[in-house]
């Protein structure tokens, strides 16, 4: 696995969960002897929804909702066999989407 790099992208709606998961990944990678770049916070995507409260009249009465998608990127430089095995066995919190790519 020499001269390779693992890029890990994390997405979650809760910033505490994503920070906890990135911390676990960083600790696991460093414990196995790999060099870690990051976590790099990417821009948070904010989706806003406006819903009419009244089903018939009163168009001025509305509720607004927002959902935020937090993203982080980690690069693991020169991973070892131990690093890959440890990352595969790592159990992260539910609600965190993980994408792993080799490059």
UniProtKB/Swiss-Prot annotation:
SUPFAM superfamilies assigned: Ribosomal protein S10
Subunit structure: Part of the 30S ribosomal subunit.
GO molecular function, one term: structural constituent of ribosome
Gene name of the encoded protein: rpsJ
Highest taxon of source: Bacteria
Protein name as catalogued: Small ribosomal subunit protein uS10
UniProt-listed GO biological process terms: translation
Alphabetized UniProt keyword annotations: Ribonucleoprotein, Ribosomal protein
InterPro entries xref list: Ribosomal_uS10, Ribosomal_uS10_CS, Ribosomal_uS10_dom, Ribosomal_uS10_dom_sf
Similarity comment text for this entry: Belongs to the universal ribosomal protein uS10 family.
Function: Involved in the binding of tRNA to the ribosomes.
GO cellular component: a single term: ribosome
